[in-house]
Every structure is written in C-alpha cells, then in structure tokens.
C-alpha cells in the first residue's frame, strides 16, 4: 500500500498543511506533523465527506434540471423564483422532513424525474433557514448519491446542507449511485441554475464573521464547478435567497468547503467536454481570489499560498543542457590543478579524483596535472584540452642577421681542466693580476669573466672551477665559448675532470687547445700527457692530429705569448662574427647579491649592444640596466659582442646560464618574467605532488625514511648551485637530504626562522651570518656551519647524515675460559671453576657457554670470584669461579666465552 506525505496531499488539494491536519484529525486520523505519511485508506476517509457535500448540493437542483432536460425547462425556472422568497420564514423542522422526502423520491428510477419537478421548489424554500444547516450535511449527501443527476445538483444542496443538521444519518452513501451521475452532467443542466451574477449582490449578507467583499465571490467558485453554467440563461435562475444560504458562516469554513470541492471535483470522471472548461475557469478564479486576498487580507494564509505557489515553481523539472562544442574546449597552459579543471568542466572535483585513482594516481584537489594527463581526463568527460601556453623562447628568438650586418668579434675562451692543475694561475699570468690569491684553498669557487687585450685584439676569458661539484658550471661554460683551453698538469696527467672537460667540449662542438702546464717541474712528463689525451681522441699536430698542444708554465710565464697566438689563430679560422646593431642578447655567467648594489650579474654579451637604460629579461627576473662595469671595475655605457660586464638593475638574482635578452619596454619584460615564474611554480608543484599508488605502497613498505634538511647560502649563485647539487647526491635509501632553501647573500633571521620551523642545518659558503641572525640561532639552537672549501662542507654533511642513522651493534670478544670443576653454592647455584685460556674474563659481561663447540646457552655472567673474593676481571693464565645467571647446567670441559656488544656508527 502506497503512502503519501501530509504536505504532498496538501499541495494536491490546494490547502495549507495545518488545514489538512485539522481535517485529518476530524476524520480520526492522527498525524504528528506535515512530514507524516498516511495510507490510501486514510485519504479515502478524508475525501468521502467532501464528495457527500457536493452530492448534497447537486441534489437540490437535480429536479429542476431534469425538467429542463425533459423540455420543461421554462416551467422549472418559473417555479423557482416564487418559492425562494419563502425560504427565509420556513421553519427548520419542516425543512428536515421535506429533505427526507426528496431523498426518497430521488431513489426512484430516472424516468420519474419529471414528477419531482415541484419538489425542488419546496426544498429551496425550506433550506432558506440557515440555523440547522451544518448538522444535516452528511445525511442529505447520502440520499443524493442514488440518482445520476444528483451530483450536478450539489451546489444548491450544499447551501441547504449547511443549515440542515440531523437528517443526514438516515441514508448511506452509495458510491455506485454517484457513477451514473457523471454521465448526465454534460447536458448543461447546471448552467441555468447557477448564475454567477446572482451571487454578487448577496455577498455582503451572509458574511457573518467576515464582512469583507471578496467572500461572496469566493463562495461562488464552488458553485461554478459544475459544467451546467453554460447551458441555460442566468437571468431567470438568480434566486436572491439561495445565494446567502450557500455562503459558509465563517471564512475558514468557506475555505475548507471550497478546496474540498475542488479536490473532489478534480477526481470525478465525467465526459471530457464537461470537465475541461470547468477546471480552466476555476483555476483562473482561484488566482484572482488569491491576489485579492493578498492585497486586502495579508496574513499567514496568504503567505502560505504564496509559499505553495513558489514551491510549485521550484519543483519544475529543469532541462539538462549540454554545452556547445566550442564551450567544451578547455584552454590551459603547461599544467592545471584538479580543482581548476573540475571547475571549468562544471563537474565535481571528487569525480576527477576518482578517475585519477582509477588511473593509479593519488591526487588531491590541489594536485597539478600536466597537459597529457589533463587531456586523458577531459576526454573521459567529453571535453577537449587545448594548450595555449605561450612559447616565450619563440617570442624571444633572435632574428637572423644579414651578412652585411656582421662584424668581427673577439673570441670567448674558456679555461677548463682538473682541480689544482693551474687554470687560474695560467689566467693570472695572462692577465698579469693576482686572481688566485683570493681563492680559498687554491680552488676556484666561481666563474670569472675577464677581458684581455693582446696586440690590439681582445680575447675574453672564462675561468671555470675544476672541482667535481661544478660540472654544471663547466657545461655552461662550454656552451657559451668559442675555444676551450684544456689545462693539464705535466706531472699529474689526465684526471677525471679532465675527461669531463673533454666530453663537454666535444658535446658543444668547440675546438680544444691543450695547455700542458707545470713543465718547469723536474717530474713533468709532457709526452705522457699527449699519450693519455690521444686515448680521449685529442691527437697532437706533431703526431698527425688536429689538436694544438702548447707546453707552458704559468709560474715561470713560459710560452704564454705562443698560447695566445694559437688562440687568435684558431679564432681566425672560425671567422667569429656578430651583429652589433640590434637588441643585446647574452648569457648570465655568474650572479650574486651585493649588499650595497643589490642583485648583480656578470653578463657575456653574445650579439647586439647592451646600453645603460635598456630593459631586459633573464630567466624569471627582469629589470633595467642601471649601471655596467667591466672586470676591472671601470664603468662602461655600452657593451658589444663577446664583452663581459657586470650589470646592476635586476629584480632578483638570476641563475647562472640564463639567457639575457634586451627588450623594448618594461611591460613586455615584466609580462615574460611573470609567465616564466608561473611556469616554474606549476612545474615545482607538479614535481612534488606526483605520487602514484605504487610509489605510495613502496614508501609504506620501506618504512620511515629519515630526512636531513639543509639551507644553503652562498656568495654567488654558481657556488650555491654547486653545493646544493653536491648535497643532493649524498641522499641514500636510508636517509634523504633535502635542500629546502638555497640563495645568495648573508645568513639572515629569516633563514634561522626557516631552519627552526623545518629542523634544518644552515650551511654558509663564503658568507657570514648577521649579528641578529647569530643571536637568534644561538637562542633557537640552530646549527650554522660556515665553509669556504666545498670539500669540508660535503664531509661534514656526511657525518651529520651518519649521525641520523641507527648505530650498528658489533660483538667484541673479551676472553675464553675452560670449565675444570663445578661446585654447588647456596644462593649462587652452580659455580664453574675455570681456567682463563686467553683474553680476560670481565664481571657482568655477556657470556656464551659452548659444549663441543656448540652454543648451549647465552646470557649474562652472574659472578666472578678468585679465592672467595669478588673481582672485576681475571686475566689469562689464572683460575677463577664463574656463575651464569639463571643457568646451572654447567659441565666439566665446557668453554665459557666472554664478550660485549658495542655500538658502531653507521657509515654511508
């Protein structure tokens, strides 16, 4: 059996929830609130009385209509008007009897209906008494059900039913009798007897409790329900007395009666022609009445109706639309977050996360998706992804030069080689300056760019570090150079970094000139160097190859002019040219943060001319050239191709190796830098957030991985990069080293606060902490390590990482004794009289009992005695008494080994 909610039924009936609950209580159905569910049986109980009322109302006019239908319409109309005036004085008792008689007559077959034509007049007269109207409603209804036409006559009877009170109990309602009635409804019997105009004047009279104007019109609606209205002329059937009887005494009762009729009428099944017009007209009148009531009777009921109307509108089913094809294309840059993609597709982020998990990717709403992943996801949901990322490199691509615009430029020479083979000493000798004096430990820590003039021709030199940590810097040096001078010590030969330099140069397609240094030493063997380099593909010209070899001594300044002549000769062969009349373009050789000047970068101009005041972009930073100076700290206003200059005016410290491009205006430079910054952020986010289910499972299986966080500060960007990369290489499966921050400049309070929050160590490379930062570090217990040689930094970090590892336990052998006799001692158990064979027996040490070289027991020594005296240890060659804790099964001939477990620090 289906159940219906109270509020749903109220909406169907067009009444308020409270009114419906009151009606349910009246028929004996108890409900707690508007959300309660009621059965169909209870709904039938509720609808029964409403049906009866309508039948009783229709009953009164059945007879007149029948007369009309039998072509005696005029007579019926003529009889009613004189009878109605008598309705008011008629006594109530007579009304009851006559009503009963009418019911009996109605039970007769339909053909006898014309005989009953006179009775309607009597009924109308008697019903004019409103005093007993309410009590007799039900009884009259029962009688009316029998004839088919009675349902049409309901409106008049309802007027009588409300005054009459007690006759209702006699007849029983017969639903079967009501069925035939609908068949006769469409004959247009009601229209003539239910004139709407007649009710208007009677409106003010019956208003009892509510004298408002809208009430007469309101009562009119139930009467108009029947389809009889259009059938007859309204003039003759306007009985003034009938109208007042129809109006309920109270406004609330009228409302209930009207709505009950509406619901009942909606449920009746009659000919289509009769039902449709009735509903249309009634709906329009209801709207008019509600509008009137909202204006003149504002109150909870009016509000309730308004709410109902709103609910009906809200409940309308919305049409699901599909975006146009052009709207199903989502434009993204390199990456997009899950939340942003879901927002653009108009779906929930959880759906995307679920789809990603099916693909084996653990993701959150802030997870960054690359273009390919986003494309796969969007395709599953019917969308397309379009990559609209600007190709900045294409925008900044340099325009080709015409042969006429090219002029000769100085060669850029990079000096490379193994650590401590004399690269900087050679450059120092060439420049005749003491560059090496300032380098800690004799190791070049950053790239230097220098301009040297020889015989009126300029040569630009780049000095690169030889330490293994500076591989990236050597690779960059090889890319921007024209010629490489490979320095090899004659007394040391080819070393690992020598091979690396050769590989970098070959990869860049740069010609190599080999400078065999330190030939002034007695142990120098230049021929061995040539032989070793030949294995790397560098064959000397003397041996039929193409590689130039020059034996030099930087210390004694031997053959330096010859080396420079070879450089110029190689440059002439290469025919190095560049266009000076265009926007400058170059490479960042080195960058640092100067306390007085801000970010400063060494720029090697490769084409065009850089002038003071030019706007530029380099990596993720932009700026304007405020000032320039050469390697000798002299201010310059412009710099042409192959000229290294220090540029002041950056917004931040660029990375070594970034491309430097001069632009027309600041707006363009700022826009490009912003796009690059956004791209870097998205890439970093994607890098850190990628974690598949398999990787997650592996991490869980491996257990806890210990982290060592570090903050690296250096004097120049190249050194910071080198140190950071060296530290990252120290990570192992057991311990992971994270460089959480790396920048140039002194150690500040911000760095200390970051180290405090992340439990990190601060490494300073050629920098010192500020006074406040030092005090804060001591207060917070932050470890600050300062270095000027990269070897020391790497070694200390290794030690720190080893300290994080769990120490390993190692067994240390102490001594061995042979059991020669056993004794049973109270409170000590069995004591073994033993002879120490080697080592020494130490009290409270760990012991192992061996029998036939098989371990029988392992535990702790209970006591150690010598001649009844407790001793700390017994050396080899002496006798002693030994007891073992919680073990007494000691036999002659057993061997007792003494040992201890010591913790040993784990090495990486």
Swiss-Prot record:
Ranges of biased composition (kind: Low complexity): 194-217, 263-276
Residues annotated to bind GTP: 417-424, 463-467, 517-520
Stretch list, region G1: 417-424
Annotated stretches, region: G3: 463-466
Ranges in coiled-coil conformation: none
Keywords: Cytoplasm, GTP-binding, Initiation factor, Nucleotide-binding, Protein biosynthesis
The keyword GTP-binding is assigned to this record: yes
Region G2, annotated ranges: 442-446
Compositional bias segments (type: Basic and acidic residues): 167-177, 278-296
Pfam families xrefs: EF-G_D2, GTP_EFTU, GTP_EFTU_D2, IF-2, IF2_N
Compartment(s): Cytoplasm
tr-type G domain span: 408-577
Ranges where the record places region G4: 517-520
Family per similarity comment: Belongs to the TRAFAC class translation factor GTPase superfamily. Classic translation factor GTPase family. IF-2 subfamily.
Function: One of the essential components for the initiation of protein synthesis. Protects formylmethionyl-tRNA from spontaneous hydrolysis and promotes its binding to the 30S ribosomal subunits. Also involved in the hydrolysis of GTP during the formation of the 70S ribosomal complex.
NCBIfam families in the cross-refs: IF-2, small_GTP
The protein's name: Translation initiation factor IF-2
Species in which this protein is naturally found: Geotalea daltonii (strain DSM 22248 / JCM 15807 / FRC-32)
Lineage start: Bacteria, Pseudomonadati, Thermodesulfobacteriota, Desulfuromonadia, Geobacterales
Name of the coding gene: infB
């Amino acid at each position: 059996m289906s159940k219906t909610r109270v509020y749903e039924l109220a909406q169907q009936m067009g009444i308020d929830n409270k009114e419906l609950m009151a009606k349910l209580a009246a028929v004996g159905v108890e409900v707690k609130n508007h959300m309660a569910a009621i059965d169909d049986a209870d709904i039938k109980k509720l609808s029964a009385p409403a049906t009866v009322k309508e039948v009783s109302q229709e009953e009164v006019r059945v007879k007149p209509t029948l007369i009309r239908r039998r072509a005696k319409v005029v007579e019926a109309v003529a009889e009613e008007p004189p009878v109605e005036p008598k309705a008011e004085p008629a006594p109530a008792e007579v009304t009851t009897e006559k009503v009963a008689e009418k019911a009996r007559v109605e039970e007769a077959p339909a053909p006898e209906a014309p005989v009953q034509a006179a009775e309607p007049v009597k009924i109308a007269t008697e019903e004019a008494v409103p005093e007993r109207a309410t009590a007799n409603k039900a009884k009259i209804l029962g009688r009316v059900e029998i004839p088919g036409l009675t349902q049409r006559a309901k409106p008049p009877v309802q007027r009588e039913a409300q005054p009459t009170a007690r006759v209702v109990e006699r007849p029983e309602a017969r639903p079967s009798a009501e069925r035939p009635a609908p068949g006769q409804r469409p004959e247009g019997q009601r229209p003539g007897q239910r004139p709407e105009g007649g009710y208007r004047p009677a409106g003010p009279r019956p208003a009892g409790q509510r004298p408002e104007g809208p009430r007469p019109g309101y009562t009119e609606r139930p009467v108009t329900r029947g389809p009889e209205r259009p059938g007859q002329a309204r003039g003759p059937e306007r009985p003034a007395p009938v109208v007042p009887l129809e109006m309920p005494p109270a406004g609330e009762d009228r409302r209930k009666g009207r709505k009950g009729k509406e619901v009942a009428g909606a449920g009746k099944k009659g000919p289509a022609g009769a039902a449709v017009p009735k509903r249309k007209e009634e709906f329009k009148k209801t709207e008019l009445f509600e509008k009137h009531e909202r204006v003149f009777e504002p109150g909870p009921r009016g509000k309730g109706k308004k709410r109902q109307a709103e609910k009906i509108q809200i409940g309308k089913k919305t049409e699901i639309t599909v975006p146009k094809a052009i709207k199903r294309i989502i434009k993204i840059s390199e990456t997009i977050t899950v939340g942003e993609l879901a927002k653009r597709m108009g779906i929930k982020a959880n759906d995307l996360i679920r789809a990603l998990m099916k693909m084996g990717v653990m993701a959150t709403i802030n997870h960054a998706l690359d273009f390919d992943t986003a494309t796969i996801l969007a395709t599953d949901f019917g969308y397309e992804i379009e990559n609209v990322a600007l190709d900045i490199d294409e925008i900044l691509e340099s325009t080709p030069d015409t042969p006429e615009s090219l002029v000769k430029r100085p060669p850029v020479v990079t000096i490379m080689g193994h650590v401590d083979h004399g690269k900087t000493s050679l450059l120092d000798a060439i420049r005749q300056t003491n560059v090496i004096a300032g380098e800690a430990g004799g190791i070049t820590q950053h790239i230097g760019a220098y301009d040297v003039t020889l015989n009126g021709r300029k040569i630009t030199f780049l000095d690169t570090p030889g330490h293994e940590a500076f591989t990236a810097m050597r690779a960059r040096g090889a890319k921007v150079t024209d010629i490489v001078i490979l320095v090899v010590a004659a007394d040391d030969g080819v070393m690992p970094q020598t091979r690396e330099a050769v590989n970098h140069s070959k990869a860049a397609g740069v010609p190599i000139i080999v400078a065999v240094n330190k030939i002034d030493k007695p142990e120098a063997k230049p021929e061995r160097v040539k032989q070793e380099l030949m294995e790397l593909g560098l064959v000397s010209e003397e041996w039929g190859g193409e590689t130039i070899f020059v034996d030099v001594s930087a210390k004694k300044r031997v053959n330096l002019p010859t080396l420079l002549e070879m450089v110029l000769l190689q440059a002439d062969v290469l025919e190095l040219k560049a266009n000076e009349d265009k926007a400058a373009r170059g490479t960042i050789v080195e960058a640092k943060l100067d306390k007085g000047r801000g970010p400063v970068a060494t720029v090697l101009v490769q084409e065009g001319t850089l002038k003071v005041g030019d706007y530029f972009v380099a990596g993720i930073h932009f700026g304007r050239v405020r000032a320039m100076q050469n390697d000798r700290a002299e201010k310059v206003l412009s710099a042409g191709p192959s000229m290294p200059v220090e540029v002041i005016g950056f917004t931040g410290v660029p990375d070594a190796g970034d491309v430097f491009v001069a632009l027309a205006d600041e707006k363009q430079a700022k826009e490009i830098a912003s796009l690059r910054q956004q791209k870097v952020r998205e890439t970093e986010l994607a890098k850190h957030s990628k974690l598949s289910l398999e990787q997650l499972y592996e991490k869980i299986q491996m257990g806890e991985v210990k982290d060592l966080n570090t903050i690296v500060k250096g004097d120049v960007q190249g050194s910071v990069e080198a140190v950071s990369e060296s530290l990252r290489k120290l990570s192992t499966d057991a311990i992971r080293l994270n460089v959480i921050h790396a920048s140039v400049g002194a150690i500040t309070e911000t760095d200390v606060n970051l180290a405090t929050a992340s439990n990190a160590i601060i490494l300073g490379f050629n920098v010192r902490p500020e006074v406040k930062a030092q005090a804060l570090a001591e207060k917070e217990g932050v470890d600050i390590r300062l270095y000027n040689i990269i070897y020391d930094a790497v070694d200390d970090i290794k030690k720190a990482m080893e300290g994080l590892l769990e120490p390993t336990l190692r067994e240390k052998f102490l001594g061995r004794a042979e059991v020669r006799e056993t004794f049973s001692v109270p409170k000590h158990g069995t004591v073994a009289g033993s002879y120490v064979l080697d080592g020494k027996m130490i009290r409270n040490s760990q012991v192992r009992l061996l029998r036939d070289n098989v371990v029988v027991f392992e535990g702790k020594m209970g006591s150690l005695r010598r001649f009844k005296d407790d001793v700390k240890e017994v050396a080899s060659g002496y006798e002693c008494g030994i007891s073992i804790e919680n073990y007494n099964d000691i036999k002659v001939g057993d061997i007792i080994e003494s040992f201890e477990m010591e913790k040993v620090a784990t090495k990486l």
